[in-house]
Amino acid sequence: MFNVNINKTPIEDVLQISFDRFTDDRGFFSETLRVNDLPFLKNTNNIVQINESYSKGSVIRGLHFQWSPYMGKIIRAIQGEIYDMVVDIRKGSPTFGKGLIFKLSSSLENKQDNMLWAPPGFAHGFFSQDDCLIEYYCTGQYSKPTENNISPIASDIDWSLANSEYVDLFKEIQLTATITDKDRNGNTLKSWLESVDSENFIFNSKGSNE
C-alpha cells in the first residue's frame, strides 16, 4: 500500500484509512490491502473472508454484527459512493449507542482510495443514493447462528457525533429508500441491551473484544 494514512474518528477504535494509487499514462495500480501496513489488525485473526456487495440507488443496509466468531470489517467502495454507518453496541462503553457516518467513494479518476475500519463491537451498515459496488475485508467468517442487527432507523441511536450533513441526508433517504423487513424491524438499542446476547460485547479499556 502506498502512503497509508490511518486517522482516528470521534469514536475510539473506529478508523479511517486512505492510501495513494500509483498512476501513469497507462492508468493506475493500487495495493488495496497489505496486512503489515495496518497495525490494528494485529489484535485480530487477520483477514479470513472477503465479501462483495452491489446495491442499487436509494438503498439502506444494516446495521449488522456477529460474534463467535467476532467479525471486524474493513469497508471500501469499488465503484460509486456510499455513506457508511457504524454504531457502538458495547455494553459499558462511554460511546454506547452513538453512531458515525462516513462517505466512501471510488472512481477511475481518484488518486486515492479510502476505507473504514469497523471493529468487533460495532454494528455496521450503509446507505446509497446511486448504484454502488463495495468490498469488505472481514476478520471472521460469517456465522448465521450468531448474527444480529440493530435497525438503522431505531429512534434511540445517537447521531450527535456524526457529520450533520450526512445525518440530514440519511433522514431524507429513509422516506423513499429500499430496506428489508429484517433490517427495518431489527433491534433498538434498548431491546439489544435487554438481550442476553449483548453480553458477548462488553467494553474494556483495551478496546473491542475479539
What are these regions (language model features)?
Residues M1-K111, C132, Q141-P145, I150-E210:
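Non-catalytic, conserved peripheral segments adjacent to functional cores
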